[in-house]
Amino acid sequence: MTQTSAFHFESLVWDWPIAIYLFLIGISAGLVTLAVLLRRFYPQAGGADSTLLRTTLIVGPGAVILGLLILVFHLTRPWTFWKLMFHYSFTSVMSMGVMLFQLYMVVLVLWLAKIFEHDLLALQQRWLPKLGIVQKVLSLLTPVHRGLETLMLVLAVLLGAYTGFLLSALKSYPFLNNPILPVLFLFSGISSGAAVALIAMAIRQRSNPHSTEAQFVHRMEIPVVWGEIFLLVAFFVGLALGDDGKVRALVAALGGGFWTWWFWLGVAGLGLIVPMLLKPWVNRSSGIPAVLAACGASLVGVLMLRFFILYAGQLTVA
């Protein structure tokens, strides 16, 4: 299979913008998951000055908005997307996803607003001094903020898994119709969130590479990566032990050709092995070059995983 035919073939329905959309949503869900867990395990490190929380403040909602814009404008009729925003169908994975996005964004904004209450009120007093409702809303959030935080964690996990459910619902593609996908995408999303957080910590001058939050992210990163490897193995073993359609899908994806090389060099090599090899360098120096190299490789690997699953998954039709 040539590079051109690898990205353009008859059974292809969803192409590269969907892969980027899945990647961005995973980063948001991963960052929020890590941020909530940091505040639960190390409350003193999860305040408004935390680099992880500040990164989540910008990238958390920003990645979702950018991902949705890519998805909307990629549709054949993007102006009809608003109908999905108000017409829900509990039998449609896409419709349920839109509902999840709406709830996720509302809770995320409220949760972050309370954490960055002092900054928000300072901005409100400077630019909108007559808008007193902001302070009233923040006061109402005080007694329910911990419960809101628990809901935020649940929604972040659901959103991270949803990207996998979206693909696994495509029953006509044996490769994609796999129950492992939601968990795999959740783990890889947390991995990408950790990479973004560590890059932000390395860039931010006030961030201590040996701080509580940096050590927390590093400790979370290791089991998540090993979990990702286990899930990839389980994913392929499940295909190998499946029916004829799943075996054909596995052979088409990993039996040689463009997507086989893409997986072994990009996903496994660059995304998993290279960051592990660079880990001692990162631990020794904790400088920007080391962190950028290791975390950049991890992020590219996660993006390449999304491309691999999406494109290789559509090579074989049941």
Swiss-Prot record:
It is a multi-pass membrane protein. Pfam families: NrfD. Keywords: Cell inner membrane, Cell membrane, Membrane, Transmembrane, Transmembrane helix. The keyword Transmembrane applies. GO terms for cellular component: plasma membrane. It is found in: Cell inner membrane. This is Protein NrfD. It comes from Escherichia coli (strain K12). The gene is nrfD.
